[in-house]
Regions:
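Domain-level signal for soluble alpha/beta catalytic cores
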Residues: 1-277
Length: 277
């Protein structure tokens, strides 16, 4: 499975480049390019139409409404569908309202969909949602995704903790893990992600052992990372579900003491309030 190069292809994002009128054209072409590559692969390859967030804030703090968000996503979804994608892939969502809009847009487009959120603030999304809350929300949707999970965030170890949070809910829905290749660092005039292929291979194996069904890489992930991940998954036997201690030992420490779930959830919230003060 791979994604089309259309992450920022909705009207709200293209408006920043005065290109909001080209949603149909750009997404259709992006989907066609992906379809062409997949069909030449010599093996089954699923083309997922990448759809990122609108970048807008929902009412009452902002101006975005549910109806408008659905309209924005539906326009992009129809263009990706016309270009030949197999599935819609919403990612890096932080607001539950936007995730619900994605579900309704996919239903309107009559397309299967997957949806991931980005957990990057003490194990929560930017809008405060925990892994447990997301899993609960997904099952309450009229049009739930065929798979759900987490992408991006602040590194593989934090993403793995989020994955364990999904698994702890007992969900039977396939889980997605799409972690960054390490942490971004500024070096010699450009941003460099410090995750090695070896680290991403460890992450991929641990994600599989944790019960994840769809494993990939987000920011900073290069062909050499993906190659190492695939070799590790194909050559290493399945193991037990990793503990938090094992994750930290192999992938590095967590960025916060709490992920907002479990016995330490209250402590995690108090710590964040203290830091803001």
């Amino acid at each position: 499975l791979f994604l089309t190069n259309t992450f920022g292809g909705n009207a709200a994002r293209l408006k920043l480049h005065t290109a909001q009128g080209r949603v149909g054209e750009l997404n259709r072409i992006g989907a066609e390019l992906g379809r062409e590559v997949a069909d030449k692969a010599g093996r089954p390859v699923i083309v997922a139409g990448s759809m990122g967030p609108t970048g807008e804030i929902f009412e009452p703090m902002g101006t975005l409404t549910h109806a408008l968000a659905v309209e924005i996503f539906h326009e992009q979804a129809e263009a990706l569908k016309s270009g030949g994608v197999d599935v819609l892939w919403f990612e890096t969502i932080s607001a539950p309202e936007e995730y619900r809009a994605a579900a309704d847009a996919a239903l309107r487009a009559d397309m299967p969909w997957c949806g991931t959120m980005s957990f990057d603030t003490a194990g929560r999304t930017m809008m405060g949602m925990t892994s447990a809350a997301m899993a609960d929300m997904v099952e309450r949707l009229v049009n739930p995704p065929i798979a759900f999970g987490a992408n991006c965030g602040v590194g593989a170890s934090d993403l793995m903790r989020t994955v364990l949070g999904f698994a702890a809910t007992g969900t039977e829905r396939p889980i997605i893990a799409k972690g960054n290749a390490g942490i971004p660092k500024y070096h010699d005039g450009h941003i460099h992600y410090d995750g090695t292929p070896e680290l991403m291979a460890e992450y991929a194996v641990m994600a599989r052992d944790a019960g994840v069904r769809i494993i990939g890489g987000c920011c900073g992930t290069m062909p050499e990372h993906l190659r190492a991940m695939r070799v590790a998954l194909e050559s290493r036997p399945k193991g037990n579900r990793p503990s938090l201690e094992v994750i930290q030992a192999k992938l590095g420490g967590f960025s916060s003491a709490s992920d907002g779930t479990g016995d330490d959830a209250g402590a995690g919230r108090r710590e964040r309030r203290g830091r803001r003060g």
